[in-house]
Amino acid sequence: MPSPNNPTRRLTVLAMLAAVAFVLSWLDSLIPLSGALPGAKLGLANRAVLAGLYRLGPGPGALLCLLKILLATFLFGNAYSFFYSLGGGLLSFVAMALTYRRCSPLFVSLLGGMLHNVGQVLVAMAVLETPGLVAYLPVLLLCGMGAGCAVGLAGGILVARCRRALHGTPDSQEK
């Protein structure tokens, strides 16, 4: 069995997570929440980013986050969505990378979901020069909490699958 630190194995897991993030971004784009709650998304692809952070570490996790943003923007978005996604993604990933060793995946995901919305509102306030957008933040924070919880709970399954791919352990032996 190859070592979990084997560069080829780690690159393979990173590529698989990037593919998962791409498919989940596509599914996320098919779920129309923006009519009811502008700016709200389920953030399904963040499951893959969370798994990458926990299984591969902050460096590969950051690369995965950037790949997810670039792929989703080029295929499903526009120039504006790139900046909103980048602002939210970077802020949330930095917070998740600073807390993932000390906190549960559920908390880390919850924090990431909320800070993603904070980052997007900050970008919107700068781009639109409208400080009043901060009034929409409580609604987006509630959405971020819900999405973060869902991603954190479901992300645990993906983390376990990545552990299995990296270490070759069956799910029943995981703790």
Label every PLM stretch briefly.
Residues N78, V94, L98, G113-M125, ...:
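Mid-bilayer segments of alpha-helical transmembrane spans in multi-pass integral membrane proteins
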Residues L44-P58, V94-T99:
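Generic transmembrane alpha-helix motif of multi-pass integral membrane proteins
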Residues S25-L42, L67-M96, P105, M125-G132, ...:
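Interfacial aromatic-anchored transmembrane helix boundaries in multi-pass membrane proteins
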Residues S3, T12-M16, V23, L64, ...:
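Short helix-perturbing small/polar motifs within transmembrane alpha-helices
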Residues P2-G52:
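Hydrophobic transmembrane alpha-helices
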Residues N6-L17, L42, N46, G61, ...:
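Residue-level signature of transmembrane alpha-helical entry/exit and packing/kink sites
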Residues P32, V49-L50, L64, Q120-A124, ...:
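Alpha-helical transmembrane segments and their lipid-water interface positions
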Residues M1-A18, V23, A135-K175:
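Alpha-helical transmembrane segments and their cytosolic interface
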